[in-house]
Amino acid sequence: MTPVNICDGWEVTTVEGLGGKDTGYHPIQAAVSETGGSQCGFCSPGMVMQLHAYLEEHPEATKLEIDNILDGNICRCTGYRPILDALKQFASDATHKKLDSLVDIEDIKLCRKTGDRCHGTCANAGHCTDYVAASAAWHQPTTLQDLQQILSQFTSETKYRIVGGNTGTGVFKRDEESYDYFVNINKIPELKAESTNPMSLGGNVSITDAIAFFNRVGKSEPMWTAIARHLGWIASYGIRNQGTLAGNLMMKNAHNDFPSDIYLSMATVGATLEIVDHSGASEQVSVEDFVTKDMNRKFIKTIHLSMAKWLPPKINIGFNRVMKYPAEFIANGGHRAGASRTFCRTFKIMPRSSNAHAYVNAGFVAHVDPENNFLISGKPTVVFGGISPTFTHATKTENFLMNKNMNDHEMFKEALQTLASELEPDFDPVLASPEYRKQLAMGLFYKVK
């Protein structure tokens, strides 16, 4: 899935490099062996390396976090209990910690420039490296100007692919067959930028980094923790590490029937995309308009996440009002005075708990006033994926719900009828039946009441 050329400048550690019978086993390897966590041995290297890589980034990982990173690792003979028993010994909240008295030998060799352990990649930094092979050419720009120059050399007929994580080939395998040029954008820092004022993310930010970003801003605006939670349902931990926001959206652009969770999440919060073409000209479009946009010789530079749309009207009736909903789904609209609160909730119904596309996914956002019978202030957002390639917003339902009371049961029955009238799932032999998907979407809408 990952092209070898993307690995230029990486520090790669294999399970053999981690330890072995000749050089001595790494503590993680030893723990798996001691707890009976390996039988046939096929899954063991993946389990060991997954934890090793995670502890490199998160040395204070908890048992729950270690549990969650294994959503892409499959064991078919040993069973997960002895494996988890071994790996959770390395958690910060473990009763018995395996690494209490052990020091990683790599930490002894420090970089004189950074004071951190040496990654051995300084010599490769900052170079635009191109490769030309018999089958295809590989370009590796390091600036936006380099990228624009490369794109300007292409025509509308040129078969090229912009490469971020390249995880999309696991979904649409035929997309990889006929490209003459590959453009690796992982060396361009602007495409990995993050900002909280105003809120934005670079197009090439990984899904894992986006989750961390939304969890950080969610501490002051809890609405974003709902988005972080939804992104955590995408694929598996390893794919989220590599896959990017723009790459996922580009799959939606090329395949409108793809039930993209990035697309749904961004539509839920009203995000806009900054699109730049080969000449450097830029424009901002909504994610809904993006799916039909011609992206030839263009790329997604930035995803803008302005909160302006979701700042509630000022209602001067008190401070620090509390809604009786789970905190992870409620934000207080910029901490302004008043009782109006932003309600945000998303769903993903899938055949498995991870590594699966949605049958139906959904997102709901509304300003509600708990002091006024949960009055919906203004126009809410009601979006669905998995209905049809052209359906996103339940526009009739959104308009019907304006300035309605959520606690009015008769009103909600009318809203369900309105929603039923505009939900028309298409037939696809690969998907669940249209009838099932329609009832599922209506059930999710009812669940937020």
Question: What are the roles of these predicted feature ranges?
Answer:
Residues 4, 14-19:
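Glycine/small-residue-rich loop that forms an oxyanion/phosphate-binding "nest" at active or ligand-binding sites
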Residues 1, 11-14, 27-38, 48-449:
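C-terminal structural segment of proteins
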Residues 21-25:
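Membrane-interfacial loop-to-helix junctions in multi-pass transporters
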